[in-house]
Every structure is written in structure tokens, then in C-alpha cells.
Amino acid sequence: MDNESQYSGYSYKSSHSRSSRKHRDRRDRHRSKSRDSSSRGDKSVTIQAPGEPLLDAESTRGDDRDDNWGETTTVVTGTSEHSVSNEDLTRASKELEDSSPLECRRFAGPIVSGVLGLFALLTPLAFLLLPQLLWRDSLEPCGTPCEGLYVSLAFKLLVLLISSWALFLRPSRSTLPRFFVFRCLLMALVFLFVASYWLFYGVRVLEPRERDYRGIVGYAVSLVDALLFIQYLALVLLEVRHLRPAFCLKVVRTTDGASRFYNVGHLSIQRAAVWVLDHYYTDFPVYNPALLNLPKSILSKKMSGFKVYSLGEENSTNNSTGQSRAMIAAAARRRDNSHNEYYYEEAEMDRRVRKRKARLVVAVEEAFTHIKRLQDDEAAASPKHPREVMDPREAAQAIFAPMARAMQKYLRTTRQQPYHSMESIISHLQFCITHNMTPKAFLERYLTPGPTMQYQRENGRGRQWTLVSEEPVTAALRQGLVFSLRRLDFALVVTVTPLPFLNLGEEFIDPKSHKFVMRLQSETSV
């Protein structure tokens, strides 16, 4: 009987549609079947999970179905429990990107540079040790001049070691699609220098067993000098050349139109892309796809409220065609008020956000008044009135309950709930309590949208980006160049514009020419 009463209520709801006569006939047929076959006819109406209400929030409203309700109605079947949405696929692909092993590519370049640099640093020492180990007895004595060269060689090697560590052995923060041309050029130059010195050393020193040890020491010092000059060249090409601004980059996010302008120097396309991404995570607001959708009332608005069907014979088609054309013309002249609906939807959203914000601020202010930092002298002065002493974590959990509902409603209204979990809010609250921050400092993260870096996971790896360019990525920036950095859900389009040439003139003004005369009027008071 319960199922029958539920079914009757559902049928009563459906009877308010425009096609009520058809639904009433179907209801009578189903009702007769339900009396005959007892429970089997009842189960064919709807299936609810245990503990769930029969009618949801949408079904409790008035039935506003149109003539096309049979075509536009979505039926939830049992297979929907195992279906996967596009958002789930995007989230799964992001997790796969984050878990992909990029450590080998990340450290391959520094490892190769370190091995080559270590080989170059050990080469001068090998030049000095090999004669001492192989033909020490036949070497000519070298006194004070060699000792001075030893000191010079030691300090030069120390400077070369420290500068090489600071310049080349830094861990890379990105993996480039192509080799860095200048870095590869410098590595090839170092290898050629060292190989040439070893070849000359083998032909002129090792093979004839050179006895002039002072000349061998000078030869090693000359190699260190050459390595120092190569390092100066590397400093200019890798660190100094791009410091002078030469181009202006306009970066636009394709989804919401957020844009920024940056001035850069002479860079290749791939290095400019890395430079843009470094600033993107700190300058651009976080990408929130939930803010891009128009209100549902606008998206579901019908452009026309009728349909014209030609069901008559050939002799009656002329009148119906004329009437249909007149109705279509009237509908075309009807003014579309979607912009008005959008305006009022935006105004209503702003009002709701301000309302939720006010409630959240008041709730947080009241919650912060429930705790107080306990000083050591206060605890010792009032032993007769013991109070519960909590650590920052317990205090954060205690005061989070009064503000939880207001926080949840505010985040849901502003569509920020995917970026703030309950655990992250409690951790941030614990951080603010530990450092004696005010409620305004606690709310700053939620009231003001932060940059993209603020919402990155602490242990997450870098995101996978795809550089799309019509030019080779190793080419230099030039006027009118356009390239994009793509991800699964959006892209960054970068337009390159050279900075203008400034022609600055000069005009001299004599300081004695600054003279003034007071213009007196009848109303002037002096």
C-alpha cells in the first residue's frame, strides 16, 4: 500500500503538465496493472536507495514540462552508476601526468655537465701528477717559480670550482623539448679545449718524456686560464644576455581571457615559454572552470515557443504556409531579453556573495573570541580555576565547528569548494592560531582569490605543458611571433612585440626664466 500511495503522488504531480490527458490515461492503465500484479507493477515506477527520499528537490516543484518533455527528459538508469563523466577523465589524466616519472629528464643535463666539468677540473692536476709518477728522477728541478705557479693554479681552480657549481650544477626546474643551444655550445667548447690540450700533452710531454717541469706547470696553468675565459663567456650567454628587455610578451588565457604583459630579453621560444610559465603560477589567478558557465536560466531559454507542422493535403498547404511564415516573422521580431536576465543574475549573485561573506566574517570573528593564548604566568597565577589547555591543532578543531557551515556556504556560492578541503582549512586555521594572526588574516585566503601557486599540492610535481609553435622552438623571439602553451583544459597564447625605439631629445631651460606676476582683481584678498 505504501508503494501504491507513492505512485499515486507521483502520478498527481505528472497530471499538471500540458499533456495531462495522455498522462491520465497512462496513470489509469498503470493503476489497474498495479491492482492485478501487486508489487511488480509498483517497482516499475521508480527505484530509490534505502534511506533516500522518494522525491528530490526538483520533483517537489511544479511540473513545468513543455510539449517536448518526452524528448528532453533525462532518464537515470542502472548503467549510470558506472558511467564516467568528462570531468572524471580530465581529473584522471591530470593524476597520470603528476605521477609520470620526470626525474631522469630533469637531472640528465646537470649530470652530464657535472661529469664534463669534473673532468676539466681534474685535467690540470693530472698534467702535474703524471710526470711525477712516471719519470720523476729525470725531471729538472723547479724551485720558487714553480711554487708561485702552484699557488696561482690552486686559487684559479678554487674559483673555477665554485663558479662552475653556482652556474652549471643548479637543479633544473623544467624540461625543454629541445636542447639549449648555448649550453650545448659551451659544453662542446669545453670538451674541444680539454681534448686538444690532452692531445698536445700526449704528443709533446708524455711521448718524449719532457724533462722541463716548469714548462709542464705553465702548460697546466694555461689550461686553467682558458677554462676561466670559457666560464666568463658562459656567464654572458646564459645569465647576462637576456637581462636587457627587448620584447614585450602578451599572455592571454584562452578560457576566461585573463592576460598579463611581460618584458623579456633575447630568448629562444622554449626559454621564453619557461619564463612565462614561471610567472604564470605567481601572477595569474587560479583557473576556475565553474565561473565560466552562464546562469542556467539563460542557457535553458527557448528562442521560439511554438512549432509549425504541415499535416494537411496539398490544397490546404497554402493557408498553413502563410500562417507559419507570419508566426515565424513575429517570433524573429520578438526582442531577446537574455542580456537583461544575465544582468539580474549577476546582480543576484553579487548580493548572495556579499551576504555569505558577511555571515562568514561574523562567524569567524565570534569563533576567534572563544580562544585565548595562555601565558605561563597566567597558568601559574590561577591554579584554583583550571581550564582545558589545548594545542594549536585541538584549538583549531574546536573553533572550526561554529564557522564550518558559514564557510561551506560561502565557498559553495563563490565556487571555491574544489580548492579548499576541510583538512586544508583546519591546517590553515592552526597556522593562523600558532602565529597569533587575526580573523582577517585567516580569511584573506578565502575572500581574495590567490595565484595559481597557492592552490598547488605541496608534494605534486610540475604540470605537463605542450609548446605549440609554427617556428622551431630553438629560434629566437622576433616581431609578430605567436606561440601557445597548452594543457588539457586551457591554453596560454603568447604574442611577441618588440619594444619601441626611444628617441630622447633635450631642451634647456634657464633657471632665471622662472618669473611670475600676480594678477590682482577687486575680489582678491592680499
Swiss-Prot record:
GO terms for biological process: actin filament organization; anterior/posterior axon guidance; axis elongation; cell migration in hindbrain; cell migration involved in gastrulation; cell morphogenesis; cilium assembly; cilium organization. Its main location: membrane. Residues 131-148, 200-215 are extracellular. Residues 15-33 have a biased composition (Basic residues). It is a multi-pass membrane protein. Signal peptide: none annotated. The keyword Cell membrane applies. GO terms for cellular component: membrane; plasma membrane. A motif (PDZ-binding) lies at residues 523-526. Residues 70-83 have a biased composition (Low complexity). The chain crosses the membrane at residues 110-130, 149-169, 179-199, 216-236. Belongs to the Vang family. PANTHER family: VANG-LIKE PROTEIN. Plays a role in non-canonical Wnt/planar cell polarity (PCP) signaling to regulate convergent extension cell movements during gastrulation. Acts together with scrib and prickle1 and localizes prickle1 and dvl2/dsh to the plasma membrane. Has an overlapping role with kny during both convergent extension and eye development. In the eye, involved in establishing proper alignment of the anterior neural plate and midline cells expressing shha and shhb/twhh. This is Vang-like protein 2. The gene is vangl2.
